[in-house]
A protein has these predicted regions:
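Short gly/ser-rich loop at a beta-strand->alpha-helix junction or flexible surface loop bordering the NTP-binding
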Residues: 1-72
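Hydrophobic alpha-helical interaction segments
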Residues: 76-167
Length: 167
């Protein structure tokens, strides 16, 4: 990962994050950056992994461990140079789940409304695996507020409301 020519890093922050452990992948806010949904560069890199690692700094970025709770929704984009990353729908669900830990409501909302072509079936699959009434409630509320902008079906909102129970 270090150039013999000038001692600088050869790999980008997404490649570094994907190589920290055998199960590591780019997640949350950093995944939105990878997909070009956020124009601003942040110096915090969020890394999901089954194996724990200590947060560390490398080349001006701080890499933060996020406990991996799902195996679903992680992909290796073609021509990605070894990058492993959550797909857009998993990134949305994870960001809503951890809304107060990483980016905050305003930032997460601006990312969600910038995503094109959200696959509702993937969203429901990830919500089902997390199996959290509160996560269904938060997701249903956010998506009902932006239903028209995001072209979200009434059925998706209905399922979120049904699964949110009394939380």
């Amino acid at each position: 990962c270090v150039s013999g020519e000038n001692g600088g890093p050869v790999a980008n922050r997404f490649q570094v994050a994907s190589a920290i452990t055998s199960s590591s992948y780019v997640s949350h806010h950093t995944a939105f950056e990878y997909y070009g949904i956020i124009d601003q560069v942040f110096y915090e890199v969020y890394v999901g992994s089954e194996a724990r690692f200590r947060d560390f700094e490398f080349d001006g970025y701080t890499y933060h461990y996020i406990k991996s709770q799902l195996k679903e929704g992680i992909e290796s984009p073609e021509f990605g140079g070894g990058v492993r990353i959550t797909d857009k729908e998993r990134t949305i669900v994870d960001s809503i789940k951890d809304i107060n830990l990483i980016a905050g409501l305003e930032e997460v909302l601006s990312c969600i409304v910038a995503v094109n072509g959200i696959d509702e079936s993937k969203m429901l699959k990830y919500l089902s695996v997390y199996d959290s009434a509160f996560l269904y409630q938060k997701t249903g509320f956010i998506f009902s507020e932006y239903q028209t902008d995001l072209s979200i079906s009434d059925e998706f909102i209905k399922i979120c409301k049904e699964k949110s129970g009394n939380s």
